[in-house]
């Protein structure tokens, strides 16, 4: 739908990505043997569709029209890295007890930040960042956890509108546009940009191991 300005094509190939396990508590978190990239975002932002797009699969991560379905940390093996799908936040129709439980799980996951290579924080490109989005970014900044904001559902806006909204969101969140990627799981738009970012992250992680 849109022209991709990124001329360089990713060399990273996602083969047969597979589900590893789900974790409901900190004790169930896995001990990774490769870089971990986490995916977080507001409920119903399109995390499952984003993961399936990267994996070239339709049903690796279960999608649902009902927000709040991801209540566990779901781990997937993507070959060169492990992807951790985190519980969605900001779902209004969940009890305070359940929200507190999710928050505790997220906090426990991020507390062990040495095991986290990067975080992709997803946000709907059609809407302004929510209070929950801002709080998540502030949390990542405070704990010095590297992240990239990934805008989802890019096919829902025209090329011009997407460009304008991307710039506005970057300003609202005090981010450089380089730290903001736009995607569409429907069309595959932006997928190469995400894979290129992952390549850079993995290369950096391997260099740090070498040092």
Please place each PLM-identified region on the residue numbering:
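Conserved nucleotide-binding/hydrolysis micro-motifs of P-loop NTPases
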Residues: 24, 69, 81, 88-90, ...
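Conserved C-terminal guanine-recognition region of P-loop GTPase G domains, centered on the G4
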Residues: 107-178
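Hydrophobic packing within well-folded, soluble alpha/beta domains
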Residues: 50, 119-120, 194
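Glycine-rich, phosphate-binding/catalytic loops in enzymes
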Residues: 36, 56-57, 99-102, 136-140, ...
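Hydrophobic aliphatic residues
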Residues: 54-58, 110, 173, 198
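Switch II of P-loop NTPase G domains
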Residues: 29, 65-74, 87-117, 125-139
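Canonical P-loop GTPase G-domain recognition
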Residues: 14-26, 156-211
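Conserved G1/Walker A P-loop phosphate-binding module
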Residues: 2-93, 208-210
